[in-house]
Amino acid sequence: MRQKTRLSNIFTISAIASGLLLAGCGEDGKDGVDGSVSGAGDVGQSVVASTTSGFSISKDAIFVAPDAVDGDDITEALSLALFDVPDDAVVVLPKGRFTVTESIVVNSASGLTLTGHGINETILDFSGSFGDDAFRFQGGSGITIRDLGVYEAPKNGIKATNVNGIHMTYTATVWEGELEENNGAYGLYPLKSQNVLMEHNYAYGSADAGIYVGQSENIVVRNNTAKKNVAGIEIENSSMADVYNNIAIGNSGGILAFDLPGLDKAYGGNVRIFNNQAYGNNADNVGAGVVGLVPPGTGMLILATSGVEIYDNQITDNDTTAVAITSYLLVDEDLGAYPANYGATMANGWSPTLKNVYLHNNTIARNGGNPTGDLLAPIAAGYGSNMNSKGSPQTFPAIMYDGIGELLSNVGQLAGFNALVGAEASADGVNYDPYDAGDLICANRNINANPAPEYDDVNTGLVYPTDPADITLVDGDGNPQPHLLIDQMVNNTYLNCTQPRLAPAVVNFKNKIYGCTGDDLAEAACAL
């Protein structure tokens, strides 16, 4: 074979926010939700106000522009309050909608709580700002941002980099109006951080990802709503992440897990995506870069990320597919150029292939009726013609696996990449050997919820066979061609295997444990 292989407005924000607040108020104030996590309301302090989520504000807090009225510019007061802020400070923003005209940068804060009076009660308008980020937290530990909304940031809403312990809750990032390419990129944006807790947030209108966690470890993303972003929720090059009880609606892609090349943290893994609702994610993709390749109409997309478990989700009404599982070879098919273009990042463990992805017990309905987007266009055309394994036009598979990386590994065509892998990554199991049982992509016990007879059966698609013995279509040079295999999802033949369950993510925030082994131990989703 040659080295080069070619592959031919459902809710208003008020309604959403009200739902989030109601969900949060039933937690009995237990630590890790709205109890003592942020340090306010301790015994001996006088409570002077409460946010709409029930967080208590004491008289000892630092109050920013307390006499401000709607439309006032509070930039200077906010900057002064957060400059060299004391440890464990609670900084309170006023009620109303206010303008901020520059990026607010906070360096190395410890134990800081920045709070408004509610997700709809305190709104900061950055439409006239001269900085890229609305808020940027650099370094520090034990930082909480809560009960406020950041609107119209020039680039990113709330960015936190190199923070150990970051909690964003009851917070909104919004670009009003239609989803457009000149909207800001990221809404809620923790990066290169540890112990990341994202809950009860709302993200709307990002031209990249509404809720994004990148190059981080120990992550819980729960009870959030992402609407009309390019990517609703994205976990990128991150390890030990639980994404559960979220709603992704009206985005281009609902929930994404990516490993991209060239980043400081070369790869992630152990990502669990469960008990989410991903429906109607059919917005036009106005994004740039790799996220701009996400096909509109994608419920979930797993791109070059190994160690992912997707289960007990409801994935419905997405025009292209419910779940697409793809190697990076769909993005860049030129294998011969990989050593030159990606050799350094491959040495650190990044791989264009993906392994150990397990989908089970998901409820899937009404997906694949109108596939769009360049990334899957040739594949969609094949399934929609007579060129697939059934020989007649088919609805695009609800679960689609490209299979090409696994096939090339199994025939030995990627074996030369082993020489690129550094010692540390190799010791962590990164390799290009033929797949063994623990590497397989598996899908079973998923539920066909299509209302018969109006819709066809939900199907599983395998673009390339993964067993070299099953290759029947090759080009003149002996390269395998897409076989476009398709099978029913229930009682399926393709991808019919199982994998061990992944470990829960654990967030340690201010010496309290969050997630399915901590404050959510009794949560129904955590027992699935």
Briefly describe each language-model feature range.
Residues 36-79, 97:
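Right-handed parallel beta-helix/beta-solenoid
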Residues 21-24:
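C-terminal motif of bacterial Sec signal peptides marking the signal peptidase cleavage site
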Residues 78-84, 99-108, 114, 124-125, ...:
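Short, T/G/N/S-enriched strand-turn elements that build extracellular solenoid repeat scaffolds
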Residues 26-28:
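Bacterial signal peptide processing site
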Residues 78-79, 101, 126-136, 152-159, ...:
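Extracellular beta-strand/beta-solenoid scaffold signature
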Residues 58, 63-76, 111-155, 177:
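Right-handed parallel beta-helix/beta-spiral solenoid domain characteristic of secreted/periplasmic
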Residues 111, 115-120, 141-152, 164-177, ...:
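Right-handed parallel beta-helix
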